[in-house]
Every structure is written in C-alpha cells, then in structure tokens.
C-alpha cells in the first residue's frame, strides 16, 4: 500500500515538474515565431536596427568573397556513383545496352 502511494506521488510530481519545465523551455508562436520555429524576417531590420544591417557591404557575387565552388559537389558525386555502378556491372558480367 505504501509503495503504491509513493509511486502515485512520484508520478504526480514528475508530471507537474515536466509540465512546468516544458512551459519554461519551449518557444511559443505568439512571440514572433511561427509554428515549427520559423521566424518571420519581414521586421528583421527593425529588430536589429538599421545601423547594423546597413553597415554590411552589398556583394554582387558572394562566391568571390566566401571562396565557394562554382559547381556543387553533388553532381560530381552522382556521376562518380553512376560510373562505379557501370564498372561493377561490367565486372559482374552484366551488360548495359543503350538504345
């Protein structure tokens, strides 16, 4: 009997604690956030102030500044995968004929 009472009290305390901690840690859509954690960026310049946003120089081509590649590596990976699949098929005796 005492074990059941203790278990019920422990369950009640855990539920209350979980509810209180969940309310304190989670973001809510009414604070400028959309459901899913997405923030609306329309009022970003008013939030940050025009001085901060206006101080960044406009760059016409960001790849020159950041040094990013002109071509994404993903097409190269897919071409390599196709090549390796074709080689593997030939080694296994399978022939692929194009019409």
Swiss-Prot record:
Modified residues (Glycine amide): 36
Localization annotation: Secreted
Molecular function in Gene Ontology: hormone activity
Top-rank taxon: Eukaryota
This protein's record includes keyword Signal: yes
Signal peptide per UniProt: 1-26
Predominant place of localization: secreted
GO cellular component: extracellular space
UniProt keyword terms in alphabetical order: Amidation, Cleavage on pair of basic residues, Hormone, Pyrrolidone carboxylic acid, Secreted, Signal
Residue list for modification Pyrrolidone carboxylic acid: 27
InterPro entries in the record: GnRH
Protein family according to the UniProt entry: Belongs to the GnRH family.
Function: Stimulates the secretion of gonadotropins.
Name listed for the protein in its UniProt record: Progonadoliberin-1
């Amino acid at each position: 009997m005492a074990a059941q009472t203790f278990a019920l009290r422990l369950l009640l305390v855990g539920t209350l604690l979980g509810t209180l901690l969940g309310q304190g840690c989670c973001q809510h859509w009414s604070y400028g956030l959309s459901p899913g954690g997405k923030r609306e960026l329309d009022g970003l310049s008013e939030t940050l102030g025009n001085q901060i946003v206006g101080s960044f120089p406009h760059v016409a081509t960001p790849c020159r500044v950041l040094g990013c590649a002109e071509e994404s590596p993903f097409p190269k990976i897919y071409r390599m995968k196709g090549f390796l699949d074709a080689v593997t098929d030939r080694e296994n005796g399978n022939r692929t004929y194009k019409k």
